[in-house]
Amino acid sequence: MIDCAAFIGSYPFRHLPHPDPDVLVRVLAREGLDGAWVGYLPSAWHRDPSGGNAALFDALAPHRSVLDPAPVVRPDWPGWERTLRDVVEQGSGCIRAYPMHWGMPPHDAQLRALALACGEIGVPLMLTVRFEDLRQRHPLDVAGDLTAAHVRALARAGRVRLVVTGAGRDLLEETHWGLTTDEQRRVHWDFAWIWGPPEDHLAHLFRTVGAERFVYGTHWPLRLTQNSRANLDLLPTELREHGITDARSLRAIRKTPT
C-alpha cells in the first residue's frame, strides 16, 4: 500500500515543519507503507508550475525507489501537452491539477482536455479539495474548496481515473450519487478528512459507496500520518476486512503521449 497524497516543500507564506523527502521516507517506513506519490506543495501557488516540477524531480531523485513524483500540469499554460508527455516518461505516479487556484470553472474546456489526455495515457489525475480547514488558512491562500461540480465534470471526461484528496462526506456523497456506475468506478477518494467515531462517517461510506472506492492518503506534512491509520483501526470489526484500493493499481500507462 502507498500513500497517494504526500508532499515535500513548504507553504510560500508560512513555515511548515518537516518538508524534506528524507523525513518522508522515514515516516513511510514507520507507518509500514511501501511508498508515496509526492507533490511539491508550493506549486499550487505558482503561476508557472515548471520550476516546482523541476525542484520536485531533483529532490526525489535519491529516493525514487520509494517516492514517485506527482507533478503539476496546468492546461491553460503553453506547451502543457509536452509537459504531460515529459513527466509521464519520467515515471510520475499521477498528475496533479489545482483548478480552484487557477480560477477554472467546472466545465472549463482546457481542464477537460487535461483529463481526456490523462485518460488516454493511463495516468491518474489527482484533485485536492483543500489543504487546510477554512478557519486555518492564511490570508494569501484565497482559493476555495474544490466543488462536486468540478469532480463530476471531470469524471465524465473519457477514461480518466480521478483521485480526489481532502474531501469530506458531504462532498463525496454529492459527487458519487450524481455519477453513473461506470463514472463512479473511475473516481477514488482518500479518507484523511473523513470523520471516524463518534460520527462514523467513514464506516457509513464503506457501507454505502464501498471500501474499494478509497485509497490511502496521509497529507504529510500537513497532517499527522497516524490520522489515516486510526481511521481504519477504529472501523467496526465487520468492516476492517473490506480492502481499500492500492493507488498504484490506478496507474496503467497505455501509450506514451505524442
What residue ranges belong to the model's regions?
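Mid-to-C-terminal alpha-helical segments outside catalytic/metal-binding sites
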Residues: I2-I8, P17-G35, T208-V215, R223-T258
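Histidine-centered divalent metal-coordination motifs
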Residues: A5-Y11, T128, G166
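Acidic-and-aromatic substrate-binding clefts and catalytic sites of carbohydrate-active enzymes
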Residues: P12-P19, S43-G51, V73-E81, H101-A109, ...
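Conserved, mostly hydrophobic/aromatic
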Residues: A5, L28, L56, L60, ...
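Catalytic pocket-lining loop regions of alpha/beta-barrel enzymes
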Residues: G93-C94, H107-V215
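Active-site neighborhood of phospho(di)ester-bond hydrolases with catalytic His/Asp-centered motifs
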Residues: M1-C4, W37-Y40, A70-V72, R96, ...
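Active-site gating/metal-coordination segments in enzymes
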Residues: D34, R47-D133
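Divalent metal-dependent hydrolysis catalytic cores, especially in the metallo-beta-lactamase
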Residues: A6-F7, Y11, D22-W45, L67-V72, ...
